[in-house]
Amino acid sequence: MPPRRSRERLKAISRILLDTATDAGAPGVDAVYGAGILNVEKAMQAQAPASSFVAADAVLTRFSSLTTSAPFGGSAAAAALSGQVGGMTVFDRYGRDFTMTASTGVRARSSGLLAGAMLAPTDAPWRAAQAEAARFGFATNVGAQAMRRPDVPAVVSFSPVAGQQVTLGTNVAVGGGNGLAGSALRGIASLPVGGMSAWSAGGWSASLSSGTSRDGRLRQQVIGFATPLGFGLELSDLAERGQVLGMRGDAALGLSGGRTTLATLTYRRTLVGVDLTARATASSTRAHGGSNLLRFDGPLIGSAFSLEGARELFGGRATLGLSSTLRVERARAVLLAPVSFDLVTGALSTRAVAVDLAPNDRELDLELGWSTALSRTSLFRVGIARAFDAGHVAGASDTAAFVTIAIR
């Protein structure tokens, strides 16, 4: 190293050591620093006004103001994104560079088996419409107590002509399941509740349902068809407000919502006394809004599936199911990531990063349940579920169980 450069570097080091020295008394020989004690630990830290560090942390917080959801991989996606946008290089007043990380990184929403409302508000058997309870050709569960319980599902059925049946309902779960595993949309929003109408005749059936989640962020409409051969098709339209498949951000990200179309093929068949139901779902999502901080490049493609078997057992009905919630298969996006920040001038440099937010693993849920009517006016349900690679995160697991006793 040339002597001149060595002298300049030694002078800079001396300046830093003197500026960061601990004042230990009244001024002595040196009228400025007095009797001081060198503080090497402090000298090794970035030196700038306290407000500069607050400003730098605010910059990182703005870039990290994202909350991921289960379809994107939950906590695994949050960790990966934090590595991209949760840190940067800062320069202090002496031109030295340091690495700084955000005080709050990218967060992940809960997506466990108890997230949302997995236990759909199904109607008890004694409240379901029965043909023998028909009044003027109608069968209904709407009675004198319905006015006192406006949140209870109400169903009315009637037969317009022989061999056909029409069912109308309100306060019913839309797109949900009967157990802990719930619907394919678990982890995106709470279970939508709304109205439904269905028609069936000779093995053919058609249905239409529409509902809104409790927080008002999600509205789902479902049209379903089924044939006598057991094959069926469901088309769903999912409108989200302020989120995209459950992913949320603050105003700076500009995610105003998303629109998802889901197509589900269903197959039902009874084999050796076991009622089998299989479902395979494909989805396409268009994100609305966005900003230079986060912009999706094209549609988000996802998939889900479930397989369930049910049969009479021990005087009740036992179910065993294997399912996987909605998982994003392709989600290409462009992120704006911070690179460096000058603590003195406030100058910020950034770079664009292309990422695919699709997770590498898939959650599998195994569920066992059993239910029986204890009497004409009481129902008992019990179930347990185990999630492997929960939230589409490798090695993560979740276990949940429920016991329900309903007495009228």
Residue ranges of each PLM-predicted region?
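Secreted peptidase-domain scaffold signal
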Residues: 43-132
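Outer membrane beta-barrel transmembrane domains
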Residues: 178-179, 183-187, 193-195, 207, ...
